Swiss-Prot record:
GO cellular component terms listed in the entry, alphabetical order: cytosol
Gene that this polypeptide is encoded by: guaA
Leading EC class: ligase
Catalytic activity from the UniProt record: XMP + L-glutamine + ATP + H2O = GMP + L-glutamate + AMP + diphosphate + 2 H(+)
The name this protein goes by in its record: GMP synthase [glutamine-hydrolyzing]
Source organism: Nitrosospira multiformis (strain ATCC 25196 / NCIMB 11849 / C 71)
């Protein structure tokens, strides 16, 4: 097995921490995110080639705020602190931090000193006096006001005189700005230099090698045992299934549960791709009557999610019991899920929506867990899917909620509503593809509204249902903006839906961003 050198990212609670990891991975190097208070023993055993301290919402100027484990500064490896990470490094190494008189949030211009090391020859332009200037993104209320012993200033501006600092001998670097965000144009170059030139990592994190490595790892871990996987047709479970099948072939059995709440022709597409084209063993269970029966009369979104999740567990457990030698349960867990689960153990957060996942399966199954995608971000999962030979349309399909159309039908779920919605949704997606807008949007779907409106078709009055169309663009799904689809495209979609889907006579377009709205309606 290939042993990659790796970067350790310690998370102090920044909204940008995952972006740091994305930038490191994009530079063809491996990294992992762990909480700032991870044990010194773990850090020593992890044996990082370099460490990045993330930003965070706390203030170093206050007592009882997070600090980096002291071992970080004793391992002899390069350390890069970003925003809060820079501040705690400076404070822990003998400098001081204070609340800034002038806070900086947004664009800033820095003057770069011509020091050897991290920022050498990295700049956006020079001014008339040949001073090198760097455009960056700031987001801070505190600043380092006294350098720790051994440090020098790398970059500054009038508002933040110590905007970037360095101890070249120990290879410790701090930046008050955020190199990981796209608003810092030279950010990728800065991270690339830290990872490869300063920490010495090779450019050895690539998908073909990772695929070969994971196939070997799965074979070694599973041995002769049988594996079962709940196949949803979504990107994550599909790529997990293809990867595991590449490794162990017929030892994998997938269970595909049709809950009656899938998209148009989805069951047939999944079976065609996996069973007939890839040769994966798939058990197709039509449980639509069970699911729809238990949803009768239920209007609360959370209650619907719980029922759908519970029914899935019962159906999956029933099918799993029929597979005699199954010892492993495979899941399409990806790295953001792992990070968020770890963060949930130490951070309080309000539940906006519960998430339906195979992870809710009961321990009575007595199966060991196999999560071959748990080291990958979503874009890496898609890249792996293409490397495995999955169809482009499947790999780049928009996200689909675990409860399916159950949370895109407002209020009570009925078979009639599901039929109307899946046909309207299919027209919407088909027209987006035809117009070249599908891949310009991050998620697009139709929502069924259980209200009727008056309409006129021909010479007659109609009184039929309403659907809403939703299309958003986003980098991370934490925030999103509504997609400004051309009016002519919206008109064509609306015309087709009201003419081709009998029972719908009105189409509206959702122009709400996130926040304040969520992407899904329920």
């Amino acid at each position: 097995m290939v042993m990659h050198q790796k970067i350790l990212i310690l998370d102090f609670g920044s909204q940008y921490t995952q972006l740091i990891a994305r930038r490191v991975r994009e530079s063809n190097a491996y990294c992992e995110i762990h909480p700032f208070d991870i044990s010194s023993q773990f850090i020593g055993n992890f044996a990082p080639a370099g460490i990045i301290l993330s930003g965070g919402p706390a203030s170093v100027a206050e007592n009882e705020t997070p600090r980096a484990p002291q071992i970080v500064f004793e391992l002899g490896v390069p350390v890069m602190g970003i925003c809060y990470g820079m501040q705690t490094m400076a404070a822990q190494l003998g400098g001081s931090v204070e609340n800034s008189k002038v806070r900086e949030f947004g664009y800033a211009e820095l003057q770069v000193k011509n020091l050897a090391g991290l920022l050498q020859d990295i700049h956006d332009r020079t001014d008339a006096s040949r001073q090198k200037l760097l455009d960056v993104w700031m987001s801070h209320g505190d600043s380092v006001n006294t350098l720790p012993p051994g440090f020098q200033v790398m970059a500054s501006n009038p508002a933040t005189p110590l905007a970037a600092i360095a101890d070249g001998a120990r290879r410790f670097y701090g930046m008050q700005f955020h190199p990981e965000v796209t608003h810092t144009p030279q950010g990728k170059a800065i991270i690339d230099r830290f990872v490869h030139e300063i920490c010495g990592l090779a450019y050895d994190w690539n998908m073909p090698d990772y695929l070969e490595e994971m196939v070997g790892r799965i074979r070694s871990e599973v041995g002769p045992d049988e594996v079962i996987l709940g196949l949803s047709g979504g990107v994550d479970s599909s790529v997990a299934a293809a990867l595991i099948h590449r490794a162990i072939g017929k030892q994998l059995t997938c269970v595909f549960v049709d809950n009656g709440l899938l998209r148009l022709n989805e069951a047939e597409q999944v079976m065609d791709t996996f069973s007939r084209n890839l040769g994966v063993k798939v058990i197709h269970v039509d449980a639509s009557e069970e699911f729809l029966g238990h949803l009768q009369g239920i209007t609360d979104p959370e209650a619907k999610r719980r029922i759908i999740g519970r029914e899935f567990v019962e159906v999956f457990q029933r099918e799993a019991a029929k597979i005699a030698n199954a010892r492993w349960l495979a899941q399409g867990t990806i790295y953001p899920d792992v990070i968020e689960s770890a963060g949930a153990k130490t951070k309080k957060a309000n539940t906006i929506k519960s998430h339906h996942n195979v992870g809710g399966l009961p321990e009575t199954l007595h199966l060991k867990l196999l999560e071959p995608l748990r080291e990958l971000f979503k874009d890496e999962v898609r890249e792996l899917g293409l490397t495995l030979g999955l169809p482009h349309d499947m790999v780049f399909r928009h996200p689909f909620p675990g409860p399916g159309l159950g949370v895109r039908i407002l209020g009570e779920v009925k078979r009639e509503y599901a039929e109307l919605l899946r046909r309207a949704d299919a027209i919407f997606i088909e027209e987006l593809r035809n117009a070249g807008w599908y891949e310009k949007t991050s998620q697009a779907f139709a929502v069924f509204l259980p209200v009727k409106s008056v309409g006129v078709m021909g010479d007659g009055r109609t009184y039929d249902f309403v659907v809403a169309l939703r299309a958003v663009q986003t980098e991370d799904f934490m925030t999103a903006r509504w997609a400004e689809l051309p009016y002519a495209l919206l008109a064509r979609i609306s015309s087709r839906i009201v003419n081709e889907v009998r029972g719908i006579n009105r189409v509206v377009y959702d122009i709400s961003g996130k926040p304040p709205a969520t992407i899904e309606w329920e």
